[in-house]
């Protein structure tokens, strides 16, 4: 029975990975119909996604994170340069050690209710760096991040894109030790972080301003 469960689990992971990497032919008529009657799973996932700022302590297992990362690197990007560098940290010593450095320079942060770490208490953090020599690298990195967050949400994993911790790590000399551990190549700069974990909240949707989008005749 255990062997059967392991085999089925492996098949599920393979299917999820294939979903992020294998091209699939679509019937345009069927896709449009599914969208109109509300059965399009991709659109449903996009519209239901929320930024999560409260997490359960359980880290996301690495097999699941590998699926999320694979979806990320399959994002569209300019000239297929793949102008990103990605690092994943689920080591509490790294996260807590960096948080202690952060607290020394921002003592008020520790007074926030429920504060445990500077990544919204997430147990897993992804660090994304862009290539400073390529104009559109930041765009590429943003597309990569969006893919990761949406794929995570489809598997019940929450996320939150964080700019503040990245800025702290690049600006504070006290954080240099931790930035060095990420081992980014020369010319790459930490752009943002993404917190990942199992949600411990169910936030409501925030309003979007549809007036910012217009068709031009």
Predicted regions and their residues:
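Acidic, surface-exposed loops and disordered segments
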Residues: 2, 7-15, 19-217
């Amino acid at each position: 029975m255990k062997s059967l469960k392991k085999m089925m689990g492996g098949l599920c992971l393979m299917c999820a990975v294939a979903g992020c990497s294998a091209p699939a032919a679509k019937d345009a008529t069927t896709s449009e119909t599914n969208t109109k009657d509300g059965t399009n799973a991709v659109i449903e996932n996009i519209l239901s996604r929320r930024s999560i700022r409260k997490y359960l302590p359980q880290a996301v297992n690495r097999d699941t994170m590998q699926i999320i990362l694979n979806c990320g690197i399959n994002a569209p990007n300019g000239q297929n340069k793949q102008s990103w560098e990605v690092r994943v940290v689920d080591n509490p010593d790294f996260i807590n050690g960096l948080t202690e450095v952060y607290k020394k320079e921002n003592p008020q942060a520790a007074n926030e209710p429920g504060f445990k770490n500077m990544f919204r208490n997430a147990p897993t953090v992804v660090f994304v760096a862009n290539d400073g020599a390529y104009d559109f690298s930041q765009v590429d990195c943003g597309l990569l991040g969006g893919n990761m967050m949406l794929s995570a949400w489809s598997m019940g994993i929450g996320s939150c894109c964080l700019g503040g911790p990245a800025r702290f790590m690049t600006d504070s000399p006290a954080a240099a030790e931790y930035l060095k551990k990420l081992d980014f190549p020369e010319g790459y700069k930490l752009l943002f972080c993404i917190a990942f974990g199992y949600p411990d909240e169910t936030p409501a949707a925030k309003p979007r301003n549809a007036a910012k989008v217009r068709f031009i005749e």
